Curated annotation (Swiss-Prot):
It holds the Pfam family Crl. Keywords: Activator, Cytoplasm, Transcription, Transcription regulation. Belongs to the Crl family. It is found in: Cytoplasm. This is Sigma factor-binding protein Crl. The gene is crl. Binds to the sigma-S subunit of RNA polymerase, activating expression of sigma-S-regulated genes. Stimulates RNA polymerase holoenzyme formation and may bind to several other sigma factors, such as sigma-70 and sigma-32. Residues 99-122 are annotated as: Essential for activity. The lineage of its organism: Bacteria, Pseudomonadati, Pseudomonadota, Gammaproteobacteria, Vibrionales.
Length: 133
């Protein structure tokens, strides 16, 4: 017996994923793929707000046949609004990891419990699998 995976409609997913926190970038998301990021740690608070850069993470959630898969990276969010992949400085690592871990708990609960769908790391993931620690 086969069962089809039933996904909530795209608009409902956007609303629910937005409610998880201030992370969903609607303009960079599309049907079946959702882009999240977090500006976790300011590099220089002495600069004017529009010139500030941050250390943080971004995560892409992609629909699969049975749920979703994710991949994420760490880096610097520059003053132009671009992510630049890179190694986090030691003094910023804890703050950045905490925000990612906190978000992943909320994301997992939503996908697995509320939607009754699967959530797995992408085969393309270069970082550690989330929730495995």
């Amino acid at each position: 017996m086969t069962t089809d995976t039933i996904f909530p409609p795209h608009g409902r997913l956007m609303t629910k994923l937005t409610a998880l926190g201030p992370y969903l970038r609607k303009q960079q998301s599309k049907e079946g793929e959702f882009f999240f990021d977090c500006l976790a740690s300011c590099i220089s608070a002495n600069k004017s707000p529009e010139e500030r850069e941050f250390w943080g993470w971004w995560l892409v959630l992609t629909a699969t046949d049975i749920g979703f898969e994710y991949r994420y990276d760490f880096g610097r969010y520059d003053a132009k609004g671009n992510w630049i992949k890179g190694t986090l400085p030691a003094k910023h690592t804890e703050a950045v990891l905490k925000t990612l871990d906190d978000f992943y708990v909320k994301l997992t609960k939503f996908v697995k419990e509320d939607c009754q769908l699967d959530l797995q790391a992408s085969a393309e993931l270069e970082e550690a699998v989330l929730g495995s620690a």
